């Protein structure tokens, strides 16, 4: 896997390049398809609010360096459909009436399904720009959805604010089952710890893991001491099933996370549970927070 940093030259040249690249992309295949005689050509994206980087194969890292949360989202392309992993913090100025969709529309004409890593406010603020939304198929989420397919977000799930109040769920993605995008398959895996609904997208063929807020470049947030146990259970599963041939990508800060950080996370969680790590105390957003640090890995536990 490698990255190609997309640079923006002038608006006119960029628009011409986008038009050409989108046409070619419509006939291209995943970089993992050896039968393809016309390799996929990455699109140059114009945006004053985003840094867009191409990741082989057919994946775009969409960073929001100007957002207060430093969000990172991912657009994952197949041949027949695309997946938007998270929607962004929604703090940038609209372009053509949208904050994220105008970026996507420069890249692809494929139908796009939104799948959120979890429901916190900084991952769902552009949710209204998507007309097809998939949820991870967890029993309590299915039971909490109305007969019309509407899911209402709680204040706890959002953390801050009251938007979005609800969303229409169009598709349920079962755990550990291939989701066919056309020439490329992904899986959704439950990774509780940061939140109960936390999920990652795994491209097993291309060895890519998109992990949301479970692990990223920065202090990891645990909301309540009771979530330390599921956090540790999840990291045990990850270490056992995804070796260092997989590349790890998070939802904040620098997109790629060293795979070895999974073991560092395991070490600090054990240290906390065994009472060997001593926290410093602070207040954040009105919460009392225990801040732990071990070997460069930080875990902040928000006390309820």
Residue ranges and their predicted role:
Residues 48-106, 200-216:
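Conserved beta-strand hairpin/beta-sheet module of binuclear metal-dependent hydrolase folds
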Residues 16-19:
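C-terminal motif of bacterial Sec signal peptides marking the signal peptidase cleavage site
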Residues 1-9:
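Bacterial N-terminal signal peptides that target proteins for export
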Residues 91-180, 267-274:
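Active-site HxH/HxHxD metal-binding segment of metal-dependent hydrolases
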Residues 37-55, 82, 89-91, 135-192, 195, 204-205, ...:
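Metallo-beta-lactamase
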Residues 60, 113-115, 134, 171-173, ...:
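Hydrophobic/aromatic beta-strand patches that form the interior of the parallel beta-sheet core
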Residues 24-44, 236-304:
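Accessory terminal helices/loops
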């Amino acid at each position: 896997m490698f990255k190609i940093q997309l640079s923006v030259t002038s608006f006119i040249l960029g628009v011409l390049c986008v038009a050409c690249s989108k046409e070619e992309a419509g006939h291209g295949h995943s970089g993992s398809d050896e039968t393809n005689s016309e390799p996929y050509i990455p699109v140059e994206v114009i945006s004053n609010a985003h840094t867009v980087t191409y990741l082989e194969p057919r994946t775009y890292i969409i960073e929001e360096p100007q957002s207060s949360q430093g969000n990172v989202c991912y657009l994952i392309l197949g041949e027949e459909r695309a997946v938007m992993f998270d929607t962004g913090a929604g703090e940038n100025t609209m372009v053509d009436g949208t904050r994220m969709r105008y970026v996507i529309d420069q890249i692809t004409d494929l139908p796009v399904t939104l799948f959120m890593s979890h429901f916190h406010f900084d991952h769902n603020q552009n949710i209204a720009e998507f007309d097809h939304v998939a949820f991870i198929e967890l029993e309590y989420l299915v039971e909490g959805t109305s007969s019309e397919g509407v899911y209402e977000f709680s204040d706890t799930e959002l953390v801050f604010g009251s938007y979005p109040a609800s969303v229409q769920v169009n598709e349920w993605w079962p755990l550990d089952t291939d989701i066919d995008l056309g020439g490329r398959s992904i899986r959704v895996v439950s990774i509780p710890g940061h939140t109960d609904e936390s999920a990652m997208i795994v491209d097993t063929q291309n060895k890519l893991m998109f992990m949301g807020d479970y692990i990223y470049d920065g202090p990891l947030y645990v909301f309540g001491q009771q979530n330390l146990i599921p956090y540790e259970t999840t990291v045990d599963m990850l270490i056992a099933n995804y070796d260092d041939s997989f590349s790890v990508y998070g939802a904040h800060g620098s997109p790629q996370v060293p795979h070895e950080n999974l073991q560092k996370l395991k070490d600090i969680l054990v240290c906390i549970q065994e009472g060997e790590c001593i926290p410093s105390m602070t207040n954040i957003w009105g919460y009392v927070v225990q801040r732990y640090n071990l070997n460069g890995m930080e875990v902040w536990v928000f006390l309820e």
